[in-house]
């Protein structure tokens, strides 16, 4: 599955690159391809969460921090579709980009911690975390090109850093914090996917988005 995701990601990224090389790639096409990348990113994070669930202790979810503790929780984002529809296109794109870039270092941390997790599928988990990085980088490049085409927002947001550089000193803490960090990413990747699909719909000037 990783090879399939990687092949499609490279193909979609190559298509997004056409716009920066002088080829006539319309905004709708660029948003379509960015939406496909974001959909794959969220699907991959869901698959990774399911892998962790197979051997995750029930007590772990009780001890896990609340979603409000995610490092991106303070980033102001639309709460629902109606609110997102009132946000200008350039600003909504800036929000999606800030969310995505906030995960550069956390995804690197997840990939570095995955091989030593106390989990029987840590090899597969490691492969998927690396694939998350590749997908995220591909989408980031696509969003940069979209911002260049649409124009930057006057309310451009900055990425939020992750505080702390490790997941804990004992195996249980590391597994719980790994799961928590992944759950935060899954939530944010869902937001990014929704925002990009909404932008795609608005670019197509559909009556109902």
Swiss-Prot record:
Q: Where is this protein chiefly located?
A: secreted
Its Gene Ontology biological processes? positive regulation of cell population proliferation; positive regulation of receptor signaling pathway via JAK-STAT; response to nutrient levels
Location(s), subcellular = Secreted
Hey, what's the signal peptide range on this chain? Answer: 1-24
Give the record's keywords alphabetically.
Disulfide bond, Hormone, Secreted, Signal
Which InterPro entries does its entry note?
Answer: 4_helix_cytokine-like_core, Somatotropin/Prolactin, Somatotropin_CS
**What's an example of a GO molecular-function annotation for this chain?**
hormone activity
Please give the positions of the paired cysteines in each disulfide bond: 70-184, 201-209
* Superkingdom, taxonomy of origin: Eukaryota
Q: Does the keyword Signal apply?
A: yes
Q: Does the keyword Disulfide bond apply?
A: yes
Q: What's in the GO CC field?
A: extracellular space
Report the family membership: Belongs to the somatotropin/prolactin family.
Q: What is this protein called?
A: Prolactin
As recorded in Swiss-Prot or TrEMBL, the protein's gene is named prl
């Amino acid at each position: 599955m990783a090879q399939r995701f990687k092949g499609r990601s490279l193909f979609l990224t190559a298509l997004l690159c056409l716009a920066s090389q002088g080829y006539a790639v319309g905004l709708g096409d660029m948003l379509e391809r960015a939406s496909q990348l974001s959909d794959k990113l969220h699907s991959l994070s869901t698959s990774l969460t399911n892998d962790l669930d197979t051997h995750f202790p029930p007590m772990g979810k009780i001890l896990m921090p609340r979603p409000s503790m995610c490092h991106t929780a303070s980033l102001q984002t639309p709460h629902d579709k109606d609110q997102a529809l009132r946000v200008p296109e350039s600003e909504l794109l800036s929000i999606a980009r800030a969310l995505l870039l906030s995960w550069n270092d956390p995804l690197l941390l997840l990939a570095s911690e995955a091989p030593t997790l106390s989990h029987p599928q840590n090899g597969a988990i490691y492969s998927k975390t690396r694939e998350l990085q590749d997908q995220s980088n591909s989408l980031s490049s696509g969003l940069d090109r979209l911002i260049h085409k649409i124009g930057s927002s006057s309310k451009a947001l900055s990425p939020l850093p992750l505080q702390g550089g490790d997941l804990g000193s004992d195996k249980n803490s590391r597994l719980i914090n790994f799961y928590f960090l992944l759950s935060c990413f899954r939530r944010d990747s869902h937001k990014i996917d929704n925002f990009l699909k909404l932008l795609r719909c608005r670019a197509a000037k559909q009556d109902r988005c």
